[in-house]
């Protein structure tokens, strides 16, 4: 029985940046540092930051006056930003720059009075933050998750209409939704390039290749990680059994019955240490060989805020 590791896999530039912001803030200012929502959706990462002194909260009313707060990689609404400013909280923004790019698209649409349609998953923090960039009461922003949702849209005119997407969606599903939107609203405008981020795209492409050569695909990632769920769904859609796991403790040995090659990948918020712990555990269950699938190389780096960057250089 062999393991085939997907490439690329694991941390993306936005996740690296978000974790660095929390770690540098703790190093410079000391504990506690408050973080609004899990800075990235991974239990192992969050528990590690908690151990260093990060305090994770869901709302700003849980943050004491004069405290430091970090916004998670998923971004926040304008309302949350304004509340932090009103209270005089010191803020470090760990919003992924690619999410910020979508925020700017929504804010521009709001300012121009253009109706906006966001393709995304209801209730996901990124979607909540993105929807919260739109405040034009005379137009509106609407959320769709599927092709079926388009028929329910309360939008009759295609004039002054635009769309954007959550950054961690299924490429295939999103393509279908965009096609259906353009069919119903031929004049609808959208971004020149898909809003789905490079890391999501690359990891989904790697899983396509992985599934072709595996009888089981294990995706290392937490249950609340959107991009990790999409990887598991993609492998299943290709006819290969797939399991989303937080780590080796989640593996059921019965999954390996009749399997010759186990494909392993990791969501963009899952650290490589978890992948390696899964590999080592599988070796105790009969794996004898480990190889890497060829894939694209990622060199993207996002800088941390200037105040933290200056300290980092020193």
UniProtKB/Swiss-Prot annotation:
Pfam families: LYTB. Gene3D superfamilies: 3.40.50.11270, 4-hydroxy-3-methylbut-2-enyl diphosphate reductase, catalytic domain. GO terms for biological process: dimethylallyl diphosphate biosynthetic process; isopentenyl diphosphate biosynthetic process, methylerythritol 4-phosphate pathway; terpenoid biosynthetic process. (2E)-4-hydroxy-3-methylbut-2-enyl diphosphate binds at residues 41, 74, 124, 167, 225-227, 269. The active site is at 126 (proton donor). It catalyses: isopentenyl diphosphate + 2 oxidized [2Fe-2S]-[ferredoxin] + H2O = (2E)-4-hydroxy-3-methylbut-2-enyl diphosphate + 2 reduced [2Fe-2S]-[ferredoxin] + 2 H(+); dimethylallyl diphosphate + 2 oxidized [2Fe-2S]-[ferredoxin] + H2O = (2E)-4-hydroxy-3-methylbut-2-enyl diphosphate + 2 reduced [2Fe-2S]-[ferredoxin] + 2 H(+). Binds 1 [4Fe-4S] cluster per subunit. Dimethylallyl diphosphate binds at residues 41, 74, 124, 225-227, 269. Its EC number is 1.17.7.4. CDD domains: lytB_ispH. Belongs to the IspH family. Catalyzes the conversion of 1-hydroxy-2-methyl-2-(E)-butenyl 4-diphosphate (HMBPP) into a mixture of isopentenyl diphosphate (IPP) and dimethylallyl diphosphate (DMAPP). Acts in the terminal step of the DOXP/MEP pathway for isoprenoid precursor biosynthesis. This is 4-hydroxy-3-methylbut-2-enyl diphosphate reductase.
């Amino acid at each position: 029985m062999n393991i085939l590791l997907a490439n690329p896999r694991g941390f993306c530039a936005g996740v690296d940046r978000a974790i660095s912001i929390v770690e540098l803030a703790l190093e410079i200012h000391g504990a506690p540092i408050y973080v609004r929502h899990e800075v990235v959706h991974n239990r192992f990462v969050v528990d590690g930051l908690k151990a260093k002194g990060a305090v994770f909260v869901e709302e700003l009313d849980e943050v004491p006056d004069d405290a430091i707060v970090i916004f998670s990689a998923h971004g926040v609404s304008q309302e949350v930003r304004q509340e932090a400013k009103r209270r005089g909280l010191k803020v470090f923004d760990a919003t992924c720059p690619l999410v910020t790019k979508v925020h700017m698209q929504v804010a521009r649409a709001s300012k121009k009075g253009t109706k906006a349609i966001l393709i995304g998953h209801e209730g996901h923090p990124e979607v909540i933050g993105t929807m919260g960039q739109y405040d034009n009461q005379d137009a509106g922003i609407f959320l769709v998750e599927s092709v079926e949702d388009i028929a329910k849209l309360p939008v009759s005119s295609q004039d002054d209409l635009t769309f954007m997407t959550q950054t961690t969606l299924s490429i295939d599903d999103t393509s279908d939704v965009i096609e259906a939107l353009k069919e119903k609203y031929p004049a609808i405008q959208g971004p020149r390039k898909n809003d789905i981020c490079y890391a999501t795209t690359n990891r989904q492409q790697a899983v396509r290749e992985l599934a072709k050569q595996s009888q089981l695909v294990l995706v290392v990632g937490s249950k609340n990680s959107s991009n990790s769920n999409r990887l598991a769904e993609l492998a299943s859609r290709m006819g290969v059994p797939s399991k989303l796991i937080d780590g080796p403790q989640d593996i059921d040995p019965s999954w390996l019955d009749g399997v010759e090659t186990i494909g392993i990948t990791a969501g963009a918020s899952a650290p490589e240490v978890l992948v390696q712990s899964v590999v080592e555990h599988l070796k105790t269950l009969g794996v004898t060989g480990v190889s890497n699938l060829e894939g694209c190389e990622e060199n993207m780096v996002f800088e941390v805020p200037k105040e933290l960057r200056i300290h980092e250089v020193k």
